[in-house]
């Protein structure tokens, strides 16, 4: 008895359609990463191996409140997008479970938040990233995290300019109080 199965062509056709949809999704993800790399002011890569889900969610909430977009992508897809944008030196940092933090409003915020949390959570490892359209190493990223943010720098400048004026006003007030000069 000769029995033929006509299910094989249907199965392969459905499987091929599924693979095409996976491939389309990967192309969309690479395009998304490409867009983020072009539109972000900075990128910090952090390895989160061994971190609990609660700690990771807490880190993501802190990123979100600072205006930092954090995403987990497959390293292979990120490598493709990095190559498309000319960031070939990033490939050495794309090993292991990585979280990508894109600085959209404040360029220093991703590295600063990661460095602060890495002190409390030694499992967080600040890797390289992108700052000012240049690939930076982990050591350079650590230096960037020590820089003041834009608002902190403005506050420091304002207090630096205000301090001599306060001292002059205080000195003049003392002279007036001692009646060495008249107002």
Swiss-Prot record:
InterPro entries: Ribosomal_uL10 (IPR001790), Ribosomal_uL10-like_sf (IPR043141), Ribosomal_uL10_bac (IPR022973), Ribosomal_uL10_bac_type (IPR047865). It comes from the Bacteria. The keyword Nucleus does not apply. One of its GO terms (biological process) is translation. Pfam families: Ribosomal_L10. Keywords: Ribonucleoprotein, Ribosomal protein, RNA-binding, rRNA-binding. SUPFAM superfamilies: Ribosomal protein L10-like (SSF160369). NCBIfam families: PRK00099.1-1 (NF000955). Belongs to the universal ribosomal protein uL10 family. Part of the ribosomal stalk of the 50S ribosomal subunit. The N-terminus interacts with L11 and the large rRNA to form the base of the stalk. The C-terminus forms an elongated spine to which L12 dimers bind in a sequential fashion forming a multimeric L10(L12)X complex. HAMAP family: Ribosomal_uL10. PANTHER family: 39S RIBOSOMAL PROTEIN L10, MITOCHONDRIAL. This is Large ribosomal subunit protein uL10. The lineage of its organism: Bacteria, Bacillati, Mycoplasmatota, Mycoplasmoidales, Metamycoplasmataceae.
């Amino acid at each position: 008895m000769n029995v033929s199965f006509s299910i094989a062509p249907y199965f392969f056709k459905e499987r091929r359609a599924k693979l095409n949809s996976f491939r389309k999704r990967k192309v969309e993800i690479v395009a998304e990463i490409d867009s983020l790399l072009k539109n972000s002011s900075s990128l910090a890569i952090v390895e989160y191996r061994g971190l609990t889900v609660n700690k990771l969610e807490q880190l993501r909430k802190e990123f979100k409140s600072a205006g930092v977009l954090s995403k987990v992508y497959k390293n292979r897809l990120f490598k493709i997008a990095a190559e498309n944008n000319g960031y070939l030196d990033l490939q050495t940092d794309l090993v292991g479970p990585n979280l990508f933090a894109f600085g959209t409003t404040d360029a220093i915020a991703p590295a600063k938040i990661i460095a602060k949390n890495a002190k409390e959570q030694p499992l967080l490892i600040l890797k390289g990233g992108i700052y000012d359209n240049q690939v930076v190493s982990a050591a350079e990223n650590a230096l960037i995290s020590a820089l003041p943010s834009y608002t902190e720098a403005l506050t420091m400048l304002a207090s630096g300019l205000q301090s001599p004026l306060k001292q002059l006003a205080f000195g003049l007030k003392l002279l007036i109080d001692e009646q060495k000069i008249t107002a």
